[in-house]
C-alpha cells in the first residue's frame, strides 16, 4: 500500500499530536536540512530578505517542505551562485498523521474490523501553519531581488493553498529595519554576531558601556 495523498491531511482538524512516549513508531520526516547556501555569511553581507508567507491555516507535509527546499535551492544556485544566498525553512514537521489501514483483498471482511478500533498507526509528519506565518526565507545581496522572488514563486507550486511572497523591510534575518540598521551598528547599539546581531540596551552597568565605546 502506497503513501496516501497529502490532500487527505491538508486541513487542521485535530489537536497537535507530536511524537512522544505515547506516540511511538513514527517514520522520520523527509526534510532533514533546514538551512542551505552560505549559512555562515556575516549579517552585513546579505541585507535583502524575502519571505514566503502562508495565506491559509493548513498542514504542509514534510515531503512538500523537502520538495520546495530543493526547488528554491536549485534556482538560487543557478542564478546567484552557491555562495550568494542563504535559505532557511522556517517550519518543522512535528505533527504526526495516522492511517487506519483497510485491506482490499478477497476475504478481507473476515480479517479486519472496519471502523471498530479505528485509531490508526503513524504514517508520517506534517507542519501546521497559520495565516501570516513565514514558511521559507531567503537572504541575499540587494541586486538579487528578482531571483529571490522567482525562487520563492517556483517553490510555491510544491504547496497546497495560497502563499504570498513578501520582500522584508528588515535587514537580513534580523528584526531591525534596514534603514536604521547601519546607523545602529555605527553607534554600537547593535553588535554583529554570525547571521544575527546582539542588541545593546541603554540600561546596564556603566563600566560595560564605557568598555564597548572606548
From Swiss-Prot:
Pfam families documented for this protein: Ribosomal_L16
Subcellular location: Cytoplasm
UniProt keyword annotations, A-Z: Cytoplasm, Differentiation, Meiosis, Ribonucleoprotein, Ribosomal protein, Spermatogenesis
Xref: PROSITE patterns: RIBOSOMAL_L10E
GO cellular component: cytosolic large ribosomal subunit; endoplasmic reticulum; nucleus; ribosome
Main location: cytoplasm
GO function terms (MF aspect): structural constituent of ribosome
Key word Transport present: no
Top-rank taxon: Eukaryota
Swiss-Prot/TrEMBL GO biological process terms: cell differentiation; male meiosis I; ribosomal large subunit assembly; spermatogenesis; translation
Family: Belongs to the universal ribosomal protein uL16 family.
Subunit structure: Component of the 60S large ribosomal subunit (LSU).
Function: Testis-specific component of the ribosome, which is required for the transition from prophase to metaphase in male meiosis I. Compensates for the inactivated X-linked RPL10 paralog during spermatogenesis. The ribosome is a large ribonucleoprotein complex responsible for the synthesis of proteins in the cell. The small ribosomal subunit (SSU) binds messenger RNAs (mRNAs) and translates the encoded message by selecting cognate aminoacyl-transfer RNA (tRNA) molecules.
Entries under NCBIfam families matching the protein: PRK04199.1-4, uL16_euk_arch
Name of this chain's protein: Large ribosomal subunit protein uL16-like
